[in-house]
């Protein structure tokens, strides 16, 4: 519900001044809407004299192109976000399956590496005892540091030891096999 003219007044102005300015502001709002209707009527009649700006470039055509570009950009963003959301959901669903499948392989490799490191630790301690007593060279397994560097997790899990389905090539791990042969 709109206030009546009598209700509109300002403390610093008389009622007649307030009413007059209110009428002007209300009439501005009314005429503002009619401009859009006139433009549509001109367009419907085929009167396109206002379609060009002073440079001769079509302003309505520019507006349509700008709107089209904006819509294309919005559509592109929505498609991209939908793709990203779908990919994330798929990864979440399959992450547990992949973990369950590869866990036993990783655990087996970890146990083998742990045994090799334990042997290297024992051999390193024995080598140190032999060196202290006789100055001898010791075991072929090498030092603990050498074994730890060679059997680092990033080297053990290098893709060159796995096929496309992340299974061990030929059922054996080349690096671990090499160190197992050294320890025997």
Swiss-Prot record:
Where is it located? Cytoplasm; Nucleus
Region annotated deca-GX3 motif sits at 82-122
- Determine if Cytoplasm is one of this entry's keywords: yes
GO cellular component terms, semicolon-separated: cytoplasm; nucleus
According to the record, the residues making up region (Disordered) are 1-68
Give the coiled coil ranges.
Answer: none
* Polar residues composition bias: residue spans: 12-25, 59-68
Keywords of the record, alphabetical order, are: Cytoplasm, Nucleus
* Major location category of this protein: cytoplasm
Q: Name one GO biological process term.
A: protein maturation
Per the UniProt entry, the signal peptide is none
The source's domain of life comes to Eukaryota
Acidic residues bias (residue ranges)? 29-42
InterPro entries to which the protein is assigned, alphabetical: Essential_protein_Yae1_N (IPR019191)
**Disulfide connectivity?**
none
Give the function comment from the record. The complex LTO1:YAE1 may function as a target specific adapter that probably recruits apo-RPLI1 to the cytosolic iron-sulfur protein assembly (CIA) complex machinery. May be required for biogenesis of the large ribosomal subunit and initiation of translation.
Q: Which family does it belong to?
A: Belongs to the YAE1 family.
Oligomer status and interactors: May form a complex with LTO1.
Q: What is this protein called?
A: Protein YAE1
Say which species the protein is native to: Lodderomyces elongisporus (strain ATCC 11503 / CBS 2605 / JCM 1781 / NBRC 1676 / NRRL YB-4239) (Yeast)
Q: Which gene carries the instructions for this protein?
A: YAE1
């Amino acid at each position: 519900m709109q206030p009546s003219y009598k209700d509109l007044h300002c403390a610093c102005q008389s009622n007649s001044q307030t009413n007059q300015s209110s009428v002007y502001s209300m009439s501005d709002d009314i005429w503002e809407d009619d401009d859009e209707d006139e433009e549509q009527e001109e367009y419907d009649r085929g009167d396109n004299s206002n379609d060009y700006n002073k440079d001769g470039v079509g302003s309505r055509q520019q507006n349509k192109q700008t709107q089209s570009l904006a819509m294309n950009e919005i559509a592109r963003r929505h498609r991209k976000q939908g793709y990203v959301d779908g990919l994330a959901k798929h990864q979440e669903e399959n992450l547990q399956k992949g973990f369950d499948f590869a866990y036993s392989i990783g655990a087996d490799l970890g146990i083998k590496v742990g045994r090799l490191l334990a042997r290297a630790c024992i051999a390193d301690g024995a080598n140190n005892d032999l060196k202290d007593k006789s100055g001898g060279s010791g075991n072929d397994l090498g030092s603990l540091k050498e074994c730890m560097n060679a059997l680092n997790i990033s080297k053990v899990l290098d893709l060159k030891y796995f096929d496309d389905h992340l299974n061990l090539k030929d059922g054996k791990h080349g690096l671990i096999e090499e160190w197992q042969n050294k320890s025997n």
